[in-house]
Design a protein with these regions (language model features):
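Extreme N-terminal starter segment of soluble prokaryotic enzymes
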Residues: 1-3
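Conserved hydrophobic/aromatic beta-strand scaffold that supports enzyme active sites
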Residues: 5, 15-17, 98-100, 130-132
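Extracellular beta-rich ligand/substrate-recognition surface
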Residues: 5-12, 93-95
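Short N-terminal binding/cap micro-motifs at the start of the first secondary-structure element
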Residues: 10-15, 38-41
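Residues that act as N-cap/strand-start positions at coil-to-secondary-structure junctions
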Residues: 12-15, 85, 125
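Glycine-rich beta-strand-centered segment in the early N-terminal region that forms part
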Residues: 21-36, 45-123
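Glycine/charged-rich beta-loop-alpha catalytic/anionic-binding loops adjacent to active sites
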Residues: 81-82, 135-137
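A structural motif shared across PLP-dependent enzymes of the aminotransferase-like
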Residues: 121-135
Length: 137
């Protein structure tokens, strides 16, 4: 399956081959037919990832506070390792899509295979061939 990912450290975008999602309880697997690219929202995400570490810190003081709290709790080196690890994890882009239900998880029986649906939610309704989406999104 193909999915648009962004590398947070460098800001680079890639269309990557990733494993297909499977339905779990409370949601459905959807084969995307279309996904929305927002010139505003996604530009902000892309611009943020392209900033230096200092630029990211200036832009997101809430994350700086989380890092400082982690340093107090866990120490400097474990925090540095956690931050670098998170920066190396690519993130899926997108938050709005439409498609056809392929699989239904337990607790989402109001949907059925073949249903056409609109989906929303960052981290769920991404630019990908297929997505797993909780039933309320």
């Amino acid at each position: 399956m193909r999915q648009v990912l962004q590398h947070v450290r460098s800001g680079a975008l890639e269309v990557a081959d990733v494993p297909e999602p499977s339905s779990s309880s409370g949601g459905v697997t959807v084969r995307n037919v279309a996904s929305l690219i927002s010139a505003g929202t996604e530009k902000v995400t892309i611009d943020f990832a392209g900033k230096s570490l200092l630029g990211k810190a200036k832009e997101r003081p809430d994350l700086v506070r989380q890092v400082l709290d982690k340093v107090r709790k866990d120490g400097l080196m474990p925090t540095v390792q956690a931050v670098l690890s998170r920066l190396d994890q690519p993130i899926p882009l997108g938050y709005s899509c439409a498609g056809v239900v392929e699989e239904v998880g337990r607790g989402a029986e109001e949907f059925g295979p073949g249903d056409r649906v609109a989906c929303a939610g960052m981290g769920y309704a991404s630019h990908a061939s297929k997505v797993f989406v909780p039933k309320n999104l």
